[in-house]
């Protein structure tokens, strides 16, 4: 599924034109109203390999009535640092407190126009507090 291209400036609403950008060495959307280039917009999310202090267990969750277990994940809020989003999402979905965060890798998913940042999140204990965010865990 192709990602839709921006047609109008998100700042002022002016129709965008394509203009050569010297630094990018290609044409980029340009707003004549703002006199600025408009680079593609995408979602940013985090996924976490949630593990205990001894790193001998990994937490997987089921959500939204789906059949398979997945990593804890969620979107980064505007203005939020990725590491903060890691701790927030783990706490919201499991009730666990993150003590250490390490970046692993990133991957762009065209289908949802999302850049996914993967981290290892070490938590204090594995006593998950079930709530409406998850269906089950293991």
Residue ranges and their predicted role:
Residues 1-5, 67-69, 131-138:
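Nudix hydrolase/Nudix homology domain
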Residues 2-48:
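Acidic, metal-coordinating catalytic segment for phosphate/diphosphate chemistry
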Residues 4, 43, 53, 111-114, ...:
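A generic fold-level signal
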Residues 17, 56, 66, 109-111, ...:
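Surface-exposed, flexible loop/turn segments at secondary-structure boundaries
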Residues 30, 70, 118:
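Conserved beta-strand segments that form the floor/walls of ligand-binding pockets within enzyme
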Residues 49-92, 105:
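Conserved Nudix-box catalytic region and its N-terminal flanking loop in Nudix hydrolases
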Residues 76-100, 105-138:
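Unchanged
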């Amino acid at each position: 599924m192709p990602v839709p291209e921006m047609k109008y400036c998100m700042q002022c609403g002016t129709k965008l034109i394509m203009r050569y950008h010297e630094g990018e060495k290609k044409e980029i959307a340009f707003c004549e109203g703002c006199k600025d280039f408009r680079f593609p917009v995408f979602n940013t999310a985090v996924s976490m390999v949630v593990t205990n202090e001894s790193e001998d267990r990994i937490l997987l969750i089921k959500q939204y009535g789906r059949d398979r277990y997945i990593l804890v994940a969620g979107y980064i809020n505007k203005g939020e640092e990725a590491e903060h989003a890691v701790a927030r999402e783990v706490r919201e979905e499991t009730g666990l407190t993150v003590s250490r965060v390490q970046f692993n890798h990133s991957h762009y998913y065209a289908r949802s126009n999302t850049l996914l940042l993967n981290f290892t999140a070490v938590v204090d204990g594995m006593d998950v507090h079930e709530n409406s965010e998850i269906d089950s865990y293991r």
